[in-house]
Amino acid sequence: FDYVLANPPFNVDDVSLSSVEKDRRFNTNGIPRNKSKVKKADEGKETVPNGNYLWISLFATSLKSQGRAALVMANSASDARHSEADIRKTLIEQNLIYAMLTLPSNMFYTVTLPCTLWFFDKAKSDDRILFIDARNIFTQIDRAHREFSEEHIQNIAVISHLHKGQRDKFIRLIDHYFAAGMERLIENNEKIEPVCAQLLDVLDDANGKHAVDELLQHWRELEKLQTHYAQYRKEYVIAAEIDKKNQTQRQLRSAFDPFFAALHEGLKRLDK
């Protein structure tokens, strides 16, 4: 196959060894075996201790010479020992593994089991393996469920692009975030003064009223920042080199940092 996407059952333990040990789809990289020697009375009845690496081998051997695969696998497969460690070593020596991404728990709707995404690429241009720890990146849906937002997915994907040296995709993503953020600020600009007026009407202590006044003063700095953003857009479009585009982005962020820090501090003061 050119591409394989798979979410196989985890930790299957009832596969007969005799049904897979002579099948090249499963034995090319080695077969998972029990650590202890099988008793003579049980010969021919032996099972594979865990089916995770049977799935891994199946997907690895199913790829064409330029093929790629992405599979969901139990976390335990990432550091399984004994015969499974030997298979993993073989996959690394074959330079098949492109990346491994550790996911947060509670990403499935029916089980809490944490898992890891394995990525294979038979057309890798180097011998590096990208490891991404995304266990603390999620949106909490409810007490038992989590998911990635669209921004989470884009941010994780851009790590892979940077790993491949594709800085232009990172720069474009940051530019997109700047544009989206500026749009949200402008959308909310008209609402700030009415909200502050309502707060002043209901607050009866001087500290609270002062915090609202300060917050409004900080917000009025947005007009200057709109000028900064317009200048950034001009320089970004003109800049031909990636480093120059990135420099303009850093300058814009430096201009916005005090604005957001002041708003954050003002909201904390108001919350008291």
Name each model feature, range by range.
Residues 2-272:
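A conserved structural/catalytic subdomain of Rossmann-like adenosyl-cofactor enzymes
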